[in-house]
A protein has these predicted regions:
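C-terminal amphipathic/interface module of NAD(P)-dependent oxidoreductases
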Residues: 1, 11, 265-289
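Adenosine-cofactor binding site in Rossmann-like domains, unifying the SAM/SAH pocket
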Residues: 35-55
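N-terminal Rossmann NAD(P)H-binding glycine-rich loop of SDR-like oxidoreductase domains
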Residues: 4-30
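NAD(P)-dependent short-chain dehydrogenase/reductase
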Residues: 144-192, 196-205
């Protein structure tokens, strides 16, 4: 692998999936000048087109890859299994082959949904993944491949990502609440949450952490905000904050329901909380709320 310490003045970082909520946040943030981030669209770099991938690499002399690209529609993944697998697993294989050929590492972004079948409390990086839906299965398969393929690769697991861009639970609830609709919300799924903005702004420090982390065998990081919650509690907070903004009460009912009372195509974990090593992150100037 290239010694990234020698490239500190001019590291070229390829970010796949740059049009997603994290990628767009990353493009908005002014980052360290010594990192040059590339956010190619699918016409110039596509995980399903090896020729375009090779051309882009040769042209831009990439030193590190951050793979944000993923098929993330959990319910639709149960239907479009082939497309989901092509992006989340086969695409990662192609990316890994490209990285290996060019002697660069990959920071693979993954998910709490690699867990699901065992509801045995908060999951640390040593817990064995056991996905309960097809999306989680493809992400777990890509994790295994990334870790086993090269010692230069690192996996970062996020959970229930929310932010300004894209579609996410918080934005959906805001729309329903502002439309004065009563809402039934699941209350028995224990979750962690990751702010897209907090993750994006800390990517330069995560790259610093990456340089050291690849020296160890446990090349997995959990990255979430502090604390745990559930979707019902999150929805109540959203309503409270909206009432403060518009300065009036919102007269709707938010009803707590059980997972068994909600119909969906894909199963969701009852407990996908992630244990985060905040002390390790703080050693690299990553301080999470």
């Amino acid at each position: 692998m290239r010694d990234l310490a020698k490239f500190n003045e001019n590291i070229n970082v390829l970010v796949t999936g740059g049009s997603g909520q994290i990628g767009l946040d990353l493009q908005d943030i002014k980052l360290k000048k010594n990192y040059n981030f590339f956010f190619p669209d699918s016409n110039s770099f596509n995980l399903l087109n090896k020729e375009k991938m090779d051309i882009f690499f040769e042209k831009n002399k990439i030193d590190l890859i951050i793979n944000l690209a993923a098929y993330t529609n959990v319910d639709q993944a149960e239907i479009d299994r082939e497309l989901c697998k092509n992006i989340n697993f086969k695409g990662v294989i192609s990316l890994s082959e490209l990285a290996k050929k060019n002697e660069v590492g990959i920071i693979q972004i993954s998910t709490d949904y690699v867990f699901g079948k065992n509801n045995d409390g908060v999951k640390n990086i040593y817990h064995k993944p056991n996905p309960i839906n097809y999306y989680g299965y493809t992400k777990f398969e890509s994790e295994k491949f990334i870790i086993n393929e090269s010692n230069n690769n690192l996996v970062i697991r996020l959970a229930s990502v929310f932010g300004f861009y894209g579609n996410n639970f918080i934005k959906t609830m805001m729309k329903l609440i502002l439309n004065n609709q009563d809402i039934n919300v699941i209350s028995d799924q224990k979750i962690s949450m990751t702010s897209s903005f907090e993750f994006a702004k800390n990517i330069p420090y995560l790259i610093d952490l990456y340089k050291e982390k690849i020296e160890f065998t446990d090349r997995i990081i959990h990255f979430t905000n502090k604390g745990y919650t559930n979707w019902f509690e999150v929805t109540k907070v959203i309503k409270d904050e909206l009432e403060k903004i518009i300065n009036k009460k919102i007269l709707i009912n938010i009803n707590a329901i059980k997972s068994n009372d909600w119909t969906s195509i894909a199963k969701r974990p009852l407990d996908s909380r992630l244990e985060v090593n905040f002390k390790e992150l703080e050693n690299f100037n990553i301080f999470l709320p």
